[in-house]
Amino acid sequence: LPISSFAAEEESSVESAAGYTNVDVPALGEPDGSLKDGGKQLTILCWNDDDLKYMYDIVADATGMDKSMINYKNVGSNGTEANEQYAQVFLSGDDVDLYFCDADWNMAYQNNDEYSAPLSAVGISEDMYANAYGYTVAMGKDKNGVLKGASWQAAAGGYAYRADLAEEYLGVTSPEDMQAQVGSWDDFWKTAATVYEKSGNTTAMADSLGGVWRAYSNGNRTKSWVNDGKLDPSSVGDFISMAKENFDKGYISGATQWNDDWLPQGMSDGAQANKTFGFFFPTWAIAKGGSLEQAEGGEGGSTYGKYALCEGPTSWFWGGTWICVYPKTDNAKEAGQFIYTMTADADAMQKYVDARGDFVNNKGVMSATTEAGTNSNPLFGGQDQFQILFNSADKIDMSIASEYDAKINTDLQNAVQDYCNGVTASEDDCLNAFLDAIAADVTDI
């Protein structure tokens, strides 16, 4: 269920990070003795090591920890699979110290004391996050207000578009001019019509139904899926109508997020060439080695560096990752060191920004990075993505989040996909299919 007092806590933390100077935070404390220590390996579960591989050296340099002690264990190929498989790993009795949780389902793990320990057990306290974006701290608490997870990133989203096609089809030569054409959903779809026509009815404005949903859901939805223990589907009607209309017109690609046909649309060669004009991507997708780099074909690919970034039709976010401590850890000291370094140590977080190009969960670091203007992202032809996303990060509001979001979002996207592909015949049928799926998948609401 939605975190109690979450909305009030989130509201109190809203402030502009522009010109923000970090306040001093306490040093990492000692473990409280409730968890085991002295183990040989610090085992970390995640669905990939895209972020982790940049953390090893940073943690080792900051703490003196031998980085060979850190053991990454892959669980699943994406966040959804990890959500389903973590519990099985826990039951197996395998070594686990830390694990990464996605925003869609971190509450389910943090609300289970058998799966997550208070961060205080490893020497971490809430006042260490005085410089963090407030929503990340609120999302790291369980239903009783106990801090169970910490995040190193703030995951604001934007619209990554083909700058070469924008100039060819729209005469647009800057992100500012592009934003003027996509600054609302009405403007976005109006521009989509022009792109589709100028491309000979081959190029969709949006990369997928899932991409549009992520931006709409986390930018325009104002109610939690679950209120007073009951499902509230009132937010979906407008989206279903918008999705169907623009899918039928060819303005939304038929590709599915994370499937093999999704990212190749971003290239100018191959079977999927030029199938989409742009992607709805958050910070982590446009960092080094992320989804955008794959969509460009990698360094030397057909569209490498040919993208640009604007805010798009709404301020939105997608995901974010929280680090949690497994209660059966045997490395309480190292677990605390790892989390503190990557989520509270400003110097270490600055190194991560420089190495990974991700947007970290520290207002002072991101304010200084943005004001310096030295960040240059080769995926965007040298554009500084932080200049676009900086203000959006302040607007992230997760007060409507619930622990059921992963299943509900998946069921909705499946229902809308079926409706757009003709499996279901009407909007009412689509909504009913969604509600039936929820009834089967989420039995306690």
Locate the predicted segments by residue.
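Helix-loop-helix "hinge/cap" segment bordering the ligand-binding cleft or interdomain interface
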Residues: 120-127, 138-211, 223-257, 327-333, ...
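Short, polar/charged alpha-helical segment
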Residues: 25-33, 48-71, 412
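Mature extracytoplasmic/periplasmic domains
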Residues: 116, 287, 316-317, 321-406
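Hinge/lid segment of periplasmic solute-binding proteins
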Residues: 11-34, 101-158, 167, 299-311, ...
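Extracytoplasmic/periplasmic substrate-binding proteins
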Residues: 52-56, 60, 106, 212, ...
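Conserved C-terminal helix/tail region of periplasmic/extracytoplasmic solute-binding proteins
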Residues: 10-27, 36-37, 373-381, 387-445
